[in-house]
Design a protein with these regions (language model features):
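Helical membrane-embedded segments and adjacent short helical loop/helix-boundary regions
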Residues: 4-155
Length: 155
């Protein structure tokens, strides 16, 4: 019984179960069920209107903004259920998750700005003459800087 409790009541195991659930939902594509295709995808962008879109073409009519909201709500509900299972303070968790999601997605979004992220083969298609060539992963660098500055109490 103690082993079962540890499989359900530790953050490490809860992370594993959440990851496996999302992975299992994504396997729906193998049988033609596009279960998570509405999730948001961030493109390298020059114009903000081109930045967000659903992952799957099946949900292209949904648009980027609603796709981002649905992604946030899906993760908020899933993570809140996990936090409740871990007996966390749910209202505090939800507010903290919302702030962390907003800041981290803003970093990811800004990291995909074409002048930062475009690779040389994409410059002409984006209509720009230069780029820092960091790819979209520049959002990770930006998030690291924001985290270090925020963690140092500067923000």
């Amino acid at each position: 019984m103690a082993v079962l409790r540890s499989l359900l009541k530790s953050e490490d195991w809860m992370s594993l179960w959440i990851g496996l659930l999302i992975f299992a939902l994504s396997l729906g594509l193998l049988v033609g069920a596009d279960i998570l295709g509405w999730a948001v995808k961030t493109n390298v962008w020059v114009s903000i209107g081109e930045a967000l879109q659903p992952v799957s073409e099946n949900y292209a009519g949904l648009g980027g903004g609603p796709s981002l909201v649905l992604t946030f709500l899906f993760l908020l509900i899933l993570m809140t259920l996990a936090a409740k299972g871990l007996e966390a303070n749910v209202p505090r968790f939800m507010s903290g998750f919302t702030v962390i999601f907003a800041v981290s997605y803003a970093c990811w979004f800004l990291g995909h700005y074409a002048y930062i992220a475009a690779t040389p083969d994409k410059l002409d298609a984006l209509g720009i003459g230069w780029s820092m060539n960091l790819t979209g992963e520049a959002g990770y660098i930006l998030a690291l800087v924001v985290g270090l500055v925020g963690g140092a109490g500067i923000v």
